[in-house]
Amino acid sequence: MRETVLEAVLRSADAPSEAQRNRFAAFLKKQYGQEVPLRWEQDPALEKGFRMEVGADLYDWSLEGRLRQFRERLEQLNPAGVSVIPLMREAVRNWQPDAAPEEVGSVLTVGDEIATVSGLEHAAYGEILQFSSGVKGMVQDLRPDRVGCILFGGSEAIESGSIVRRTGKTAGIPVGDGFLGRVVDALGMPIDGQGDIPSEGYLPIESPAPGIIDRQPVNAPMETGLLAIDSMFPIGRGQRELISGDRQTGKTAIALDTVLNQKGKGVVCIYVAIGQKSSSVAQLVENLKHKGAMDYTIVVNAPASASASLQYIAPYAGTALGEYFMRKGRDVLIVYDDLSKHAVAYRTLSLLLERSPGREAYPGDVFYLHSRLLERSAHLSEELGGGSMTALPIVETQAGDVSAYIPTNIISITDGQIFLESSLFFSGQRPAVNVGLSVSRVGGDAQTKAMKKAAGALRLDLAQYREMEVFTQFSSDLDETTKRQLIYGQGLMRLLRQPQNHPYQQHQQVILLVAALDHVMQTVPLARMDDFRTRLLTYIETQDQALCRRIDESGQLSDEDRETILKLSREFLTRFQTEAAEKSGE
C-alpha cells in the first residue's frame, strides 16, 4: 500500500527558528508516523501564535484559535441551578490549550440551502459542521472527494473557499419542563417573544426506536373526545394513527380536539407544524391559550417561510422533546401536521444534493424517512418507566387518492388510519370520517369496557345503512322495515356530527351511544337531533351525577347503569315530544 504523501504548511508573522523547526519536525513525526516536510508561509495577521495545516488537519495555535477553544470550554459548563462563578474560576485555572488537530475543509459551492465541502475525509453522516460565518450545517451526502450538507441558516455570508470545521456532534435539541406552554423553532429556540427557555439537558434529534423488549402492549385509551372515533376507531396510548384526507376536510381539527380533550389528564401534547402558514399557527396557538390547553402543550413550528432544512428536521426535534417526557414516565401525544410537506421538503433537499430520484421524484429512502420517525412512538415497559408517546401523523391526499406514494407508505407504518372524505365534509357530516376505509388495528384493546359495551354494533349498523342508501337511489318503492332502517341510519349519522372544540367526556359518549343504539332517538326529527342530544346530556347529568362519575372513574358500564340510562332517556324523550307538541299546537 502506498504511503500517503503529506506536507505541513506553517503560517505565522515571523519565521520559526531552527530549534523551533526541529521541534515541529519531531512533533509531526510522532503524530503521523513519518517524516513530514515543513513549509513556512508568512501571515502578518498572526502576530501572536501560528497555524499549521497538515492535509485536512489544522493546528490552530493563534490567539483567535485559543480563545475559541476557551469559549467552547465555558459553553460546556452545565450549572443546572448551581452558581456558575466557581465553575468558571476552576475552568480558567485548569484550562490548557488543546494541541489536538482540528479537521477543517473548505467550501466548494454554496446555494439553495446546500453547501458542498472538500477536505473533511472523516466527516460522518448527520454530523454538524461549523462554517466560518457562524452558520451551522448537517452532513447529508458523503462522496469520495466531498461532502454535501444542508444549512440551518442563510447562505449569503458563506463564500466559496471559506473554512468549515467539524464539531464531532450530531444535531440535537435542548429539552426540559420549561418548554411546556412555549412555541419554538426546529432548533428548539423560542419564537414566541417570551424570553429564553431554561433547559435541563440536550437530546439528539435522531435516536434509535425502542426495541421489542423495551415495549409493552397498547392497553390504555388516548381519548379524542370525538364520538365517531372513540366509538369505532379507538386510539391507545403508544399507538400511531394516521389522519388522512384532502385539503380542508378537518384533519387538523381532529388533532386539535384530541389535544383539547387531554386537559386535566396529565398528557403532554406536542404539535409540530411543518410548512404551515405562520398566521394559521398563530391562530392555533391563540385557540389553545383560550381553551387553557397551552399549559400542557409545546408547539414546534417550521413554517412555509422556513428553509427546507428546518422543515426536514422539525418532526425529529419534536419527537426528541416527546422522548424526554416519555422517559420520565409521562404520557405524550404528538401531532405531525403534516408529513406530506415533510416529504416534499426532503425531496427538495435530496434533488439539490443530486440524489437519484425515484417514484414521484422522491428519493429511494423516503419510506425510511418516516418509518424511523414513527417507530419512536411506543408504550415503554414498566422497567423503563411505563411512559408512552402516541403519534397522530397527518397526510394530505389529492382528490381522495389513498393509493398515492406517501399515504400508502405511512399507512403501512402506522397502526391504523382515519380517512376523511370531502363529500361527507361538505354535506355537513363533521368530523367527515369514512367508516369503510378507516380502521384502528391495536386501539380496540385499549378501549374501556364501558365504551366497548355501549358502542356495540354501531359500525355494522352504519355499514348496512350506507349500503342500503346506495340501493335506495334506484328504487322509490320501499317497505316499512327498510324505511325504518334508513331513518335509524340517518339518525346515527346525525348523532356522530360534533362541533369543533367541543370534545365529549366518556360518560357523555356512553349515554349517547346507549340511547341511540336502543332506538330511543328513532322518532326524533333530524332537524331537532342536535337540540335533543344537548338537552338529553344535561338532563341525565342533572338527574344522576353519581352514574356519570362512576362511568368516568371506573370505565365500566354495568347492566344496572345501562338500564338507568335508557329509563332516563325515555323519560326525557317523552318530555321533549310533549314540549314539541305544545309548541306546534300554539
Regions found by a protein language model. Give the residues of each.
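Phosphate-interacting basic helix/loop segments used at nucleotide- and nucleic-acid interfaces
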Residues: 32-36, 86-95, 225-229, 318, ...
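Conserved P-loop NTPase nucleotide-binding/switch module
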Residues: 247-274, 278-280, 290-292, 308-419
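N-terminal accessory targeting/assembly segments
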Residues: 80-182, 187-191
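Short, charged, intrinsically disordered terminal tails
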Residues: 66-91, 574-586
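Elongated, mostly alpha-helical coiled-coil "stalk/stator" tethers of large membrane protein machines
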Residues: 1-82, 123
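P-loop NTPase nucleotide-binding/switch module
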Residues: 162-164, 171, 175-178, 191-239, ...
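Conserved catalytic/coupling modules of large nucleotide/cofactor-utilizing molecular machines
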Residues: 341, 351-586
